[in-house]
Design a protein with these regions (language model features):
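Phosphodiester-processing cores and adjacent nucleic acid-binding clamps
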Residues: 1-255
Length: 255
């Protein structure tokens, strides 16, 4: 089976939206044979510490093995033949580590995040993932600014600050609530193209157009979402070919 990692996931820290606890999400991903999972709660990173601690606990045995192998490698009494074999064993052990990916589904304002002009400007969704330590620090900075300077119904960030703190981040275009999907649904295809090119111009290969397909199977579910996703996906796949932007498939996990 093709490896898959969830990159768009809401925990119970997505207030009044997500239902799953972080341990339940991690345990389910591990049970399904996944190498990692991202937590991308709406507008906040409240669950990141719990996420990190729980994954560290789940990785305890593997980390213990890696530590033991490194100690053996550093031991001057280890036989040369054994020493030569240890690096490969360490790399093999690292493959068994479950990877926590820190992220946030941010709200991006249409104008400056400090402007409180349009009450409807609660922000367009954007999935932001930390690629490395620098990205983690930039993500924390952006989320903090969204709360302290950009809050207007929701904690919002703007493109000026996204560009300023872009280093080390991976960006995904998000769900139907993202700026590009919303423009596509409104028939503003050329505007959507311009926005995609803006993101690509800053993040390059670290910018992805996000495909989702959630077909409702129960009567009380929202059956309007799936056909809209199919419509948006067709345009996103066309953009991918025309603009050279990579695609990523996600599920908008809430429970």
């Amino acid at each position: 089976m093709q490896p898959f990692v969830h990159l768009h996931v809401h925990s119970q820290y997505s207030i009044l939206d997500g239902q799953a606890s972080i341990p339940a999400l991690v345990d389910k991903a591990i049970a399904n044979g996944m190498r990692g999972i991202a937590i991308t709660d709406h507008g906040n990173m409240f669950g990141i510490k719990e996420f990190f601690n729980y994954v560290e606990k789940k990785n305890g045995d593997v980390n213990g093995l890696i530590k033991s192998l490194k100690k053996e490698l550093d031991n001057g009494e280890t036989a040369p033949e054994r020493r030569a074999a240890i690096p490969a064993e360490i790399e093999e052990a690292k493959k068994k580590l479950f990877i926590p990916i820190f992220g946030c589904e941010m709200y991006v304002s249409l104008g400056a995040m400090t402007e409180h002009i349009d009450k409807k400007d609660t922000g367009r969704h954007l999935v932001v993932l930390a690629k490395n330590e620098k990205g983690y620090h930039n993500l924390v900075k952006l989320v903090s600014l969204a709360w302290t300077d950009g809050f207007y119904s929701h904690p919002r960030i703007d493109k000026e600050h996204l560009e300023k703190y872009h280093e080390g981040l991976i960006i995904c275009s998000a769900c139907l609530g993202g700026e590009i999907p919303r423009l596509i649904q409104a028939g503003e295809i050329e505007k959507a193209r311009e926005v995609a090119l803006w993101f690509k111009g800053i993040w390059g290969d670290d910018y992805y157009l996000e495909l989702q397909r959630h077909k409702a199977t129960v009567p009380r579910a929202n059956h309007d979402v799936y056909p809209r996703q199919v419509e948006v996906n067709e345009v996103l796949m066309r953009f991918s070919k025309e603009l050279g932007i990579k695609l990523v498939c996600t599920n908008d996990v809430h429970f």
